[in-house]
Amino acid sequence: MRDMMSMMKKAKEIQEKMQQIQEEMTNLQMIGTAGGGLINVTLNGKNTITAIKIDPSLLKPEESEILEDLIMAAHNDAKTKIEIAMEEKTKSMTAGLPLPSGFKFPFS
C-alpha cells in the first residue's frame, strides 16, 4: 500500500514538473543564423517563427535561391537550439525523479 502511495505521489510530482516545463518552454526564444549572420530566424518554444531578419544584400532576384536556402538553414539552427534547451531544462527539472531510462516528455 505504501508503495502505491509513493508511486502516486511521484506521478503527481512528474505531472507538475511537466506542466512547469511546458509553461517555461512557451516563453523560450532562440535565434538561428545562417550565411554568417545574413539571415536570422527567431523561434519560440512551440517552434513558431516569431521573426525573420534578412540582410538587404540578399534581396536581389538573382539571389533568391540562396536566400531560400539560408532561411531554411537559419530555421533549422533555431529549431535545434530550442530542442537542446528543452532537453536541458527537462533534465534539470526532473533530476531525482524515478523516470525510466530513455523516457521523453512530449512537448511539441
From Swiss-Prot:
A GO cellular component annotation here is: cytosol
Q: Which UniProt keywords apply?
A: Cytoplasm, DNA-binding
List the PANTHER family.
Answer: NUCLEOID-ASSOCIATED PROTEIN YBAB (PTHR33449:SF1)
> What does the record note on quaternary structure?
Homodimer.
- Record carries keyword Cytoplasm: yes
Q: What does this protein do?
A: Binds to DNA and alters its conformation. May be involved in regulation of gene expression, nucleoid organization and DNA protection.
Q: What is this protein called?
A: Nucleoid-associated protein BQ02190
The family classification in the record reads: Belongs to the YbaB/EbfC family.
Where does this protein reside within or beyond the cell?
A: Cytoplasm, Nucleoid
